[in-house]
Amino acid sequence: MRKQNSDFEARFISEEGSRLKNRDYFGYVELDEFACYVIADGITEVTDVESARLAIETVILSFQENPSLSKRTVKRLLKRANRALLGKESDRRLKASITVVVTDYQKMRYGYVGNTRLRMYRGGAVYRQTRDMSLAQEMVEQEKIAKDELMQHEERNNLYAYLGQKNFKPVVSKKIKLAETDMIALYTRGIWENVDEAELDDVFAEADNEVQTTVDNIEDLLLSRQPENLDNYTLAVIFVNKVYQNPEKRKRIKKIVMITVIVVIAAIVIGVVLWFLRDRKVQRTEDMNYHFTNTVEYINTGNYVRAKEECEQAQKLAEKL
């Protein structure tokens, strides 16, 4: 029911660039209650797509077996993909960068390792983004190189974390509540080596309701550079046109509001009663003191009859306090 009552639109491109083969891969599955989007960049120097394809197929199949939005699930998906690459018989070690996004059509969570990137936009501005696990990225953070130098820096693909290593430590985000008109971009190095972040931001800031137009605009921007050595490039864009709304949640909210109103009204009534009682007590105390003062004055003047009457009045008021 969630998928039918929400609208997530995904489009992608994946091309070999100037390479002989495309070692990038993108895949996704949209189930009734959950969806999973995965992008991978094979970084093994062989001419097939084994690393990225194997990683994504493993993630998608594992997700379909037990779909969930939990942090544990995202870690499990990435670890299974890592084991798949480690266990594959090959002349060369299989390695890849990967980014996984899972959603229940209300919230999302992502996990990644390597230098495939996620960039999420809300209201036309960057809302979330991944951080490359490369030496060049660390140099940027240490202010050894400028941020715009990372695109072509010689250490940009020198990764300290990736699929296919024994000490595997992926990064998994917290849950992110989705909003309508959110936009999510997943892309490989063929994109970010040639189109800088500011240019991407401009495209998404000016994006209309057509996700395919946004994908085409970014590819046009990339190809307009006419790079001599264009790596494989893959870009996937997901538009969140409508977030699933739980009908039971509306009932719960209404019930909570009604209970809150009742509690507030009760608190006001109790407050008024307490104030009234306190006000009466203050007035009685003042009256008691008045009669007691009169009692003393009548005693001093020798009017004992009036003194007795005033004393009795003061005593009655004291008993009511």
Positions of the model-derived regions?
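PP2C/PPM-type serine/threonine phosphatase catalytic domain
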Residues: 1-321
